[in-house]
Amino acid sequence: MPSLKDLRNRIASVKATQKITKAMQMVAAAKLRRAQNAAENARPYAERMAAVLGNLATNLTPGAETPRLLSGTGADRVHLLLVCTAERGLCGAFNSSIARLARDHARRLTAEGRTVKIICVGKKGYDILRREFRDQIVELIELRGVRQLGFDNAETIAQNLLGRFEAGEFDIATLFYSRFRSVIVQIPTAQQIIPAEIPPAGEAAQTDAAYEYEPDEGEILAALLPKNLTVQILRALLENAASEQGARMSAMDNATRNAGEMIKKQTLVYNRTRQAQITKELIEIISGAEAL
């Protein structure tokens, strides 16, 4: 049985940990509102951009050349996985769920005879995936020093992908991130971004008004596709940021509650041990008095 000193030290240690988890929960809650607003504001813009591209694609002049960012290379040999996770941990299963989705996708492609390349955005996803795909990871992009994600961050990543695509390094690129739904629900998501996925013709027609394009649909489509890539990556980064803070807030809340339960149990053990020790000392005193 542990001594009273050991129990006091244990209780003090858990209380110190509880203060840390409570502080982290409050910080995550403060960051969550801003991150959630940014993610929710980015959604309609990204969805509208995809709808406009769908309208343009369906109205291309017959026989016009389709941009490679929409038509692809015509091959399906090399797949690039852009896996977006966090730079830090202590956010529940947020990082592992995204990495698991990417890992399963990579395994399936490998089993089908495809070549897989991986770019990790965020250190935690890299730490998980390198155990199995060390040779397939071609780059790690860290955002540790970025205080607030913005268009410039997404554009840098998009230009990286465009350069690799134009150099013929891959045929298809898939983006992995976590879509934010609520504090306790974040959905790991895979989205093909090269060649761009656009809404079906019927869906595009329902969401878009009639447009007249100048100079023509082909030129506008070619100009918008790189911007759409940046927008889709930006949306993923913002969704990830909100999901990370929601997951961390939930995880730290659970940790704080568990610490409270542990403190109660250890305090009960401490009181019982102290009571037993006092009782033992009283018995020894009484026995000594009777012996006299």
Curated annotation (Swiss-Prot):
It is a peripheral membrane protein. GO terms for biological process: proton motive force-driven plasma membrane ATP synthesis. SUPFAM superfamilies: ATP synthase (F1-ATPase), gamma subunit. Disulfide bonds: none annotated. InterPro entries: ATP_synth_F1_ATPase_gsu (IPR035968), ATP_synth_F1_gsu (IPR000131), ATP_synth_F1_gsu_CS (IPR023632). The keyword Ion transport applies. One of its GO terms (molecular function) is proton-transporting ATP synthase activity, rotational mechanism. It holds the Pfam family ATP-synt. It is found in: Cell inner membrane. NCBIfam families: ATPsyn_F1gamma, PRK05621.1-4. F-type ATPases have 2 components, CF(1) - the catalytic core - and CF(0) - the membrane proton channel. CF(1) has five subunits: alpha(3), beta(3), gamma(1), delta(1), epsilon(1). CF(0) has three main subunits: a, b and c. HAMAP family: ATP_synth_gamma_bact (MF_00815). This is ATP synthase gamma chain.
